[in-house]
Every structure is written in C-alpha cells, then in structure tokens.
Amino acid sequence: MRAKSHRYPESSECYTDTTYYDPEDKYLDIGFQMLKSINIKRYPEFSYLEKLFINNNNLKQLPDPQYLPKIKELVCSYNILTHIPFYPNLIKLDISHNQVQNINVYNQSKLLYLDCSFNKNIETRIFLPECRELYVNDANISKLEINYFPNLRILDCSNNNISRISSLSSLIELNIQNNHITELPSYPQLVRIMADNNKLCYVPTFPNLLSLSVSYNNIVKITDQPLLKKLVANNNSVIELGNLPKLKFFDLSFNKLNSVTIPSSAKYIFLQFNNFVSVDIDNCIGCVKELQVDFNIYSRIYSKYFDNIYAINIQTNRDKLHYYLQQYSQLSNEHIVNQILNKFNGIKFKEHTKKLFGISVGLYELIFVSQTIKNTSDKESYDKYFQSVLQTDYFKKFYEFIQYVYYNSIIVTLYFNGYIS
C-alpha cells in the first residue's frame, strides 16, 4: 500500500495547522501545513524520528541528513522538491508529485519501498537490491530496467512510454497500463497483471495468476490460466479462450467470439457485442449473479432463462450509440448524442416501441423540418403539415433507423439467484 500522511485528507487544498508527534512510534506528521521550509529548531524530536510525514506542503528543500540520523520512513510527496538528500537508514521513501529527476544517491541503498511517480523524466537506473515495491507511474519514461531491482514484488510503471519490459522471477503484481508494450515475458510468481491499453497480441500462461486485466489491446486468444479468478479483456479481438476452470468474474465484451464455454464457477459475466448466435449458462446457473449481453443475445435467451432471472436492467452504450448516429451528420454532435442517450436510458422496455416512436418524431422534427415552416405556420396548419410528414417514406426509414440504433447499442444486465447490484 502506498504511503501517505494518515492524519490528513488526500486533497491538497485542505490544510490544517495541527502537528502530530507520536514518541512511542517515533513519527512526526506535519503534512498539509503549507510549509515553505522546515525550521529545525522547532522540532527537537527530529533526532529521534524514524518516520516523518511532510507531504502536501510547498517545500523546495529537505532537512540535512545530520538532523534525521535515525529516519527510516520518509513521505515528502506533493511538494516542489528537485533534490533528495541521502538518509542512510531509509527503507521507505515516497517522493511522488515533485520535480525530482535523479535519485542516484540511493544506488545500492537499503530501500524496500520507493514511490517516485509523477516526477517527469526521472532517472531510474539505480541498483536497489532489497527493494520490494516500486512506483514509477506517470513519469514520462520510455525505458525501465527492472533487473536493477532483483527482489521486486510490486511494480507500477503505468502511464508512461515504455515499449519493452523484462522478466523478473520475484514479481507478484505488475501494473503496466497505458504504455506501448507488445509482449509479456514469463513471471512465474505473478498473481496480478494490469496491462490495459498496450499493444499486446498474446498473453502467456502464468501458473499462479489470479487477476488479469488486458482491455484495449490486440489479443486474439486467451491462453490457459489454471488459477485465474478475474479476467477483464474487453475491446480486443479475442476469438478463442483456453481453459479457465476457476474463473468467477470475466469481461469479454467487445470482442469477436463466436462461442464460449462458461466455467461452472462463473458469477459475473460480461459478453455484450461479440459474434455469438446464443449463450449457454446452464453450466453455472446455480451460482451466476450477473450476466451482461447485448439485445441480440437477450432476445434469444430470455425465454429459456425466464424462470431464473431475478431482475433486468437496460442501459445504452454511449460508444455504440455515437458510432451508429454518425450515419446522420445532424445527429453526431455531442449535444444531440447526449440527448438521445438520456432518452434511451429513460425507456422502460415494455414501452420501448411507443417511446422510440416519440423519440423519432422529436428528432425528425428537430433536424428535418425547417425553422421557416415552424415560424410561419399557425399551430393547426403546422400540425396538419407535420402529420403528413410522418406518413412519408423518409420518416418511416428514419424511425426504422432509430429502432436499429437502440437495439444495437443497448446492454441488458440480467440478475440471477436473488442478486442485484
């Protein structure tokens, strides 16, 4: 877990002049104090401190190491620091959200925990043989040599420009989201991977993996994962699934699956917008809690599972809606899209035919009937004119289009076994 002041809120806009010192635990918390400098004379306890929280201030400089001879944990995030002194006994260091570009003074140090995230272009080529947790996300780096951290357990290098990452046998948790990585090497101990929004085409088998998140990649096949419990792989090109016998939660929406074998352990299933003819959940009907599908699949399985369905919720997917509305340039601006989204989401499904007709009438009048006619006609004449418009083939085609958009952009959530989110 990332370090922070545990007496004050996370918002950097919230300050208090309360200082807390715990002589038994040997820690001092002066976070959120709007401090521009630290007057050593005000804090005689510095010489005994093992933990110091000075986060969320306006500090440009840290105390000289001679005044903190026993310090082991230092949290100085959210300041304007450019340099970090060397504290020889330090094992935990959080310098996130500063302007530091170099921490070479800690090369071969005893650090177990290092958070240097949100320091643009920071140099990470330092050897930390004992480091267990490293956070270097949002740092605008393009390269990370993780072999410099041979005992690393947790790594977060998300939101960077990294294209390659090496293998490391000790790693159990990896976050590489929002990079340019094309390949995942072997990590024999890995338990959790977060690799969304990269350029992955393939995910190898990880024998101990419990959670895998790889949305927005180019993955075609999900390989065997013997212990995997959670899979989030939406917005890929998946056409094939390996053996996933322990899966409880899986999101494979927006892929290219023609069929899927759902494991008996599955509880939360998201399969909308694939190429299914139908979906069979007989194998997990006793334990499934939530199933999300598109309208096409819903219409095919509703009667089969009618007695098992506890509740139904229908929502419109905005991306799909916007995609279809682009066929009419007049419907593609953000205001109109949001208006239609809200109207679609307000439809009770048993009334959807009537509601869709009303929505079609309103939209057709808005974009196709000239303002001149509206302004120059009296109400009776205009109503008569508009009723004649509704009988034209142009309107009928438009109404059919709105129905098509609705049916192809809604997501139907089915709840089972007494569960509702």
From Swiss-Prot:
Keyword Repeat: yes
Pfam families, sorted: LRR_1 (PF00560)
Cell wall biogenesis/degradation listed as a keyword: no
GO molecular function: signaling adaptor activity
UniProt repeat feature LRR, residue ranges: 48-69, 70-85, 89-110, 111-129, 130-150, 151-172, 173-191
Keyword terms of this UniProt record: Leucine-rich repeat, Repeat
Transmembrane portions of the chain: none
Protein name (Swiss-Prot/TrEMBL): Putative leucine-rich repeat protein R380
